[in-house]
């Protein structure tokens, strides 16, 4: 969607400001819930702000040996922005009206693609580890 919209913008005769957005919003918490639900894990969130943590509530996936009640996520102060606006929603109406752009990719589809790809990567990492090889982490 994003690349398609950029291409459409480049086809216009005059430069203008454009908002590339779906007009929908989701919380980080709901995004995390979607990701874990994709692999059959339900989370329970406790606390607020910097003290918020996620715990394993249930799991229907036998591949993962997850302990019910185990803390698996917590807010990282490095990324927490207490003064952040509560709700951010981009307005794509100009792009829809002037260019006929309508997003085709849903958040659910993105989560599905992302989680499927990450699971394949983690299987590869596990295979290497079990074979006695070290795998480097090039990410934060």
Task: Give the location of each predicted region.
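C-terminal substrate-binding subdomain of Rossmann-fold SDR/epimerase-dehydratase oxidoreductases
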Residues: 1-140
């Amino acid at each position: 969607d994003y690349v398609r919209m950029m291409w459409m913008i480049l086809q216009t005769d005059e430069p203008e400001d454009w908002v590339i957005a779906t007009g929908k919003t989701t919380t980080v918490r709901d995004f995390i819930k979607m990701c874990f639900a994709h692999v059959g894990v339900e989370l329970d969130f406790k606390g607020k702000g910097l003290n918020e943590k996620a715990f394993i509530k249930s799991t229907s996936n036998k591949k993962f040996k997850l302990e019910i009640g185990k803390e698996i996520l917590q807010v990282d102060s490095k990324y927490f922005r207490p003064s952040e606006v509560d709700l951010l929603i981009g307005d794509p109406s100009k792009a829809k009206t002037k260019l006929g752009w309508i997003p085709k990719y849903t958040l659910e589809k993105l989560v599905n693609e992302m989680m499927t790809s990450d699971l394949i990567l983690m299987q590869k990492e596990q295979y290497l580890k079990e074979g006695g090889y070290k795998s480097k982490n090039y990410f934060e």
